[in-house]
Amino acid sequence: MAVSRLPPAALSLKQFLQRQKVLCLYRDLQRTIRRVPHESDRKYLRDWARDEFRRNKSNTDQDAIRMMISQAHNHLEELRRSLALAGC
């Protein structure tokens, strides 16, 4: 019987790719938040994003994760549109 060299907690390919999407989305969100002109708004948005991602960190349901990624993309695009309208 062949023994796997992977650690028992290794992610599947699908999980790995989904994790990369989430990390990329988080970084894009943080970069976009840096463009917000007011420091208090930036802090609020940064804390909100961090709390949302941390709260859902342990979620393993693939469908729920896909839904959350979609919602986060919508929030990111809405923030980008708002910043574009504000001229930032």
UniProtKB/Swiss-Prot annotation:
Compartment(s) of residence: Mitochondrion
The organelle targeting sequence, given as a residue range: 1-19
Record's keyword terms, sorted: Mitochondrion, Transit peptide
Keyword Transit peptide: yes
Pfam families linked to this entry: Complex1_LYR (PF05347)
GO cellular component, one term: mitochondrion
CDD domains, sorted: Complex1_LYR_LYRM2
GO biological process, one term: mitochondrial respiratory chain complex I assembly
Family membership: Belongs to the complex I LYR family.
Its biological purpose: Involved in efficient integration of the N-module into mitochondrial respiratory chain complex I.
Name of this protein: LYR motif-containing protein 2
Originating species: Danio rerio
Gene: lyrm2
